[in-house]
């Protein structure tokens, strides 16, 4: 009986592994039709009795402002071009910070955030962390860095029910994702840790200070030259 159960478990795991590889491989070229986070937001709105219409328009890489690409990297994951999905230094720093009793600090890379947004539910558990690591590894192995950032910019939430760069640009600044200025991009990047509480178009003093810091980091990263290096940094 035990051997039968173990065989069933192994078979299920193999099917899951093969299926997830296939899905991630397809999404290397095909825009995701939606994300787990979008489904979660929809369900939350129904449960609360206040259904919302999600705002989202997919924009390809070359129709998203380079300013926004650099701003997001500057604010969220400055080692994006270097790591394979996990920033070990940031993880260690977050663990030390949290052990000292400070406010909870995360250390998720852009690749990890893509994994969570696309495939996983909110919350904290060992199962979810394990699945996040699995999908992050697949994304890093099967996608280019450019593709990871493209999917991130089209799936991240920028306000209640507002997903992706184009919807965010329209919602906050009444412009297109391709036309975002350095200042606008820095404000969008500044709210990403908490986009449902902070506003890019009506920023608090903290968000304004964070946006200023992000603009400094953008200059230090090198702007367009950084993106050119990002495009050529991939293994295959």
Swiss-Prot record:
GO terms for molecular function: pentosyltransferase activity; peptidoglycan glycosyltransferase activity. It is an enzyme of class 2 (transferase). GO terms for biological process: cell wall organization; peptidoglycan biosynthetic process; regulation of cell shape. It catalyses: [GlcNAc-(1->4)-Mur2Ac(oyl-L-Ala-gamma-D-Glu-L-Lys-D-Ala-D-Ala)](n)-di-trans,octa-cis-undecaprenyl diphosphate + beta-D-GlcNAc-(1->4)-Mur2Ac(oyl-L-Ala-gamma-D-Glu-L-Lys-D-Ala-D-Ala)-di-trans,octa-cis-undecaprenyl diphosphate = [GlcNAc-(1->4)-Mur2Ac(oyl-L-Ala-gamma-D-Glu-L-Lys-D-Ala-D-Ala)](n+1)-di-trans,octa-cis-undecaprenyl diphosphate + di-trans,octa-cis-undecaprenyl diphosphate + H(+). SUPFAM superfamilies: Lysozyme-like (SSF53955). It is a single-pass membrane protein. The chain crosses the membrane at residues 12-31. Pathway: Cell wall biogenesis; peptidoglycan biosynthesis. Its EC number is 2.4.99.28. It is found in: Cell inner membrane. Its main location: membrane. The keyword Cell inner membrane applies. InterPro entries: Glyco_trans_51 (IPR001264), Lysozyme-like_dom_sf (IPR023346), PBP_transglycosylase (IPR036950), Pep_trsgly (IPR011812). Keywords: Cell inner membrane, Cell membrane, Cell shape, Cell wall biogenesis/degradation, Glycosyltransferase, Membrane, Peptidoglycan synthesis, Transferase, Transmembrane, Transmembrane helix. It comes from the Bacteria. GO terms for cellular component: peptidoglycan-based cell wall; plasma membrane. The keyword Transcription regulation does not apply. Belongs to the glycosyltransferase 51 family. Peptidoglycan polymerase that catalyzes glycan chain elongation from lipid-linked precursors. This is Biosynthetic peptidoglycan transglycosylase. It comes from Pseudomonas savastanoi pv. phaseolicola (strain 1448A / Race 6). The lineage of its organism: Bacteria, Pseudomonadati, Pseudomonadota, Gammaproteobacteria, Pseudomonadales.
């Amino acid at each position: 009986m035990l051997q039968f159960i173990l065989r069933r478990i192994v078979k299920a795991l193999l099917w899951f592994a093969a299926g997830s590889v296939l899905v991630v491989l397809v999404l290397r070229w095909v825009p995701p039709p939606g994300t787990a986070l979008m489904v979660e937001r929809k369900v939350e709105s129904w449960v609360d009795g206040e259904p919302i219409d999600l705002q989202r328009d997919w924009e390809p890489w070359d129709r998203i402002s380079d300013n926004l690409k650099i701003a997001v990297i500057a604010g969220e994951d400055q080692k994006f071009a270097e790591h394979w999905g996990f920033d070990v230094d940031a993880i260690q720093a977050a663990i030390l910070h949290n052990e000292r009793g400070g406010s909870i600090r995360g250390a998720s890379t852009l690749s990890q955030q893509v994994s969570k947004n696309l495939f996983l539910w909110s919350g904290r558990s060992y199962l979810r962390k394990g699945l996040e690591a699995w999908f992050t590894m697949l994304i890093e192995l099967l996608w280019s860095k450019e593709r990871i950032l493209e999917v991130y910019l089209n799936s991240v939430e920028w306000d209640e029910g507002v997903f992706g760069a184009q919807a965010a640009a329209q919602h906050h600044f009444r412009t297109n994702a391709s036309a975002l200025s350095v200042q606008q991009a820095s404000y969008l990047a500044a709210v990403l840790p908490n986009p449902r509480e902070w506003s890019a178009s009506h920023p608090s003093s903290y968000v304004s200070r964070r946006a200023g810091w992000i603009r400094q980091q953008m200059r230090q990263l090198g702007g367009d030259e950084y993106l050119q290096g990002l495009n050529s940094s991939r293994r295959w």
